[in-house]
Amino acid sequence: MKKKKKNYTFNKKNKKIYNIKEAIQLLKNKKSAKFIESIDAAFNLNIDPKKSEQNVRGSVLLPHGTGNTIKIAVFTTGKNIKIAQLAGADYVGLEDLANLITNQKKKIDLVIASPETMHIVGKLGPILGPKGIMPNPKFGTITKDIKKAIQEAKKGKINYRNDKNGIIHSNFGKINFSEKELYENFLTLYQDIKKSQPNQFKGIYYKKINISTTMGPGIIIDHLSL
């Protein structure tokens, strides 16, 4: 006889800790919004964000992407201009692109730059920095391989970094993804953040992890079972 699948119930006052597979099933059962919600994770790390050597940042390609369509701007020169356009960049240029960003007339989700253009891109720090899209070699967004950077971003590569409270917030899929896809995306993200643990850090790395839909409450994950 086929084993009946459990159905988990949840409300805002529920403080129970769930394993990740239970939590994902719970979110999918609870969906109520009239749009396709994103699934987000919050990793509360036991680091001191005031110490630069303990800050965590990185990038990872999720096996099933995020389900988001992103707008990519590329600063580059020479033959890479055509390469960027063919790879699917939405905006490509130099000073003209810098002016577009300065005037904030277009929605841009990711900025990629060739190394030789950073004298222009660097001046955009006050605009791009607060949005978390300033090109950075640690994220692979300052690169000579423009084509690869664009293709990976389109496939679902995400960048992450802790905020001032030591928490990493990241999207890892949509509510219409299968449970298997969400689980594999979450596990990939979790393992990459774990791999990025600072060398100087000692002790328990994860304080708490929870996941939620765009409009829903957080569900606490039993990270010790991962």
Curated annotation (Swiss-Prot):
Pfam families: Ribosomal_L1 (PF00687). The keyword RNA-binding applies. GO terms for biological process: regulation of translation; translation. GO terms for molecular function: rRNA binding; structural constituent of ribosome; tRNA binding. Keywords: Repressor, Ribonucleoprotein, Ribosomal protein, RNA-binding, rRNA-binding, Translation regulation, tRNA-binding. GO terms for cellular component: cytosolic large ribosomal subunit. It comes from the Bacteria. InterPro entries: Ribosom_uL1_bac-type, Ribosomal_uL1, Ribosomal_uL1-like, Ribosomal_uL1/biogenesis, Ribosomal_uL1_3-a/b-sand, Ribosomal_uL1_CS. Binds directly to 23S rRNA. The L1 stalk is quite mobile in the ribosome, and is involved in E site tRNA release. Protein L1 is also a translational repressor protein, it controls the translation of the L11 operon by binding to its mRNA. Belongs to the universal ribosomal protein uL1 family. Part of the 50S ribosomal subunit. This is Large ribosomal subunit protein uL1. The gene is rplA.
